[in-house]
């Protein structure tokens, strides 16, 4: 239990409503205010969660008791809203993706450093026990030298998904949202980068095959990683029925297959019945972004995904888009 409660405010009450509920359930955190442009939505959330509400972001930022802001607005606004909060002296966490533009991520990182505040990105899969154990197994060399990583995400999103939301249609527009790689696929891009490390080269293709949208509903890419591994990506939102998501990790000594958040396969050449349970998760490891922010703000711990780490997936999906536009391989250095 923390020695004091840290005051939180949440901006945007779509997915942000779930994070506001998480704040209420987390020891050491206190939800003080929620903010949404829709007065009825903000009022209803405040009544449920027993906190204040406002339709004015500036008003919430003026509150000295609100130390941490969670940003859950359209993707193209993430860093602008984060920067506004950090300039007001607030610590910030942003829902995925960090933004849709690398330069905006860079600006937010600079502001966080200048203002001396915490900047984190909410990639919930980083807190999952299985994913932590896979990462530990890879770091321990259980698969040996990594050779290949394949990501397949084949989901179903109907036209109403893109036409709806608030503001209406924002998920379909390049200015406010990326497509299947930047929106749905970014969780898995982040896992790939976490598991294998930085990408060296990207050859990508993106297009819109089945929806009336500006953004893409399919992205494909071939990757090389700095550790020598190769990789491939398919991220699509027109697969009916949804075929889910899968990550296959192949090394010299064996293979791990991650399927929809579960362990599909763990086989090693020279060991029968290997188990990821050999890798223990520290008891004090944060279980979600709220616990992570409390640890970062109160004890100075580094969040699971800070600004620099959150930027990496934005750089990757933008490289896929750039390669698709130019028809050339993008070298990320």
Residue spans for each PLM region:
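C-terminal glycine/acidic-rich active-site capping loop/insertion
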Residues: 124, 245-312, 330-333
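Conserved SAM-binding strand-loop segment of SAM-dependent methyltransferases
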Residues: 50-59
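C-terminal helix-rich "cap/oligomerization" subdomain common to oxidoreductases
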Residues: 1-2, 68-71, 226, 295-333
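N-terminal Rossmann-like dinucleotide-binding module
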Residues: 1-48
């Amino acid at each position: 239990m923390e020695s004091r409660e840290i005051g939180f405010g949440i901006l945007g009450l779509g997915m942000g409503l779930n994070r506001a509920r998480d704040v209420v359930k987390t020891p050491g955190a206190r939800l003080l205010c929620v903010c949404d442009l829709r007065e009825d939505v903000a009022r209803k959330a405040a009544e449920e969660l027993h906190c204040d509400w406002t339709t004015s972001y500036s008003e919430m930022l003026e509150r000295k008791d609100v130390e941490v802001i969670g940003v859950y607005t359209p993707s193209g606004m993430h860093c602008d809203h984060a920067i506004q909060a950090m300039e007001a002296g607030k610590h910030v966490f942003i829902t995925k993706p960090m933004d849709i533009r690398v330069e905006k991520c860079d600006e937010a990182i600079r502001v966080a450093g200048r203002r001396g505040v915490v900047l984190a990105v909410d990639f919930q899969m980083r807190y999952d026990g299985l994913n932590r154990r896979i990462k530990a197994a890879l770091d321990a060399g259980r698969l040996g030298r990594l050779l290949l990583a394949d990501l397949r995400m084949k989901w179903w999103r109907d036209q109403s998904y893109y036409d709806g939301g608030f503001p209406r249609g924002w998920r379909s527009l390049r200015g406010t949202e990326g497509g299947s790689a930047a929106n749905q696929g970014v969780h898995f891009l982040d896992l790939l980068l976490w598991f294998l490390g930085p990408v060296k080269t990207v050859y990508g293709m993106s297009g819109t095959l089945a929806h009336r949208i500006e953004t893409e509903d399919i992205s494909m890419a071939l990757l090389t990683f700095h550790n020598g591994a190769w990789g491939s990506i398919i991220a699509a939102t027109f697969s009916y029925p949804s075929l889910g998501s899968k990550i296959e990790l192949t090394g010299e000594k064996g293979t791990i297959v991650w399927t929809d958040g579960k362990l599909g396969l763990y086989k090693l050449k020279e060991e029968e019945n290997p188990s990821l349970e050999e890798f223990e998760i520290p008891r004090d490891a944060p279980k979600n972004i709220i616990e992570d922010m409390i640890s970062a703000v109160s004890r100075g711990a580094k969040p699971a995904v800070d600004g620099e780490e959150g930027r990496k997936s934005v750089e990757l999906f933008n490289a896929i888009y750039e390669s698709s536009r130019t028809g050339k391989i993008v070298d990320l250095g």
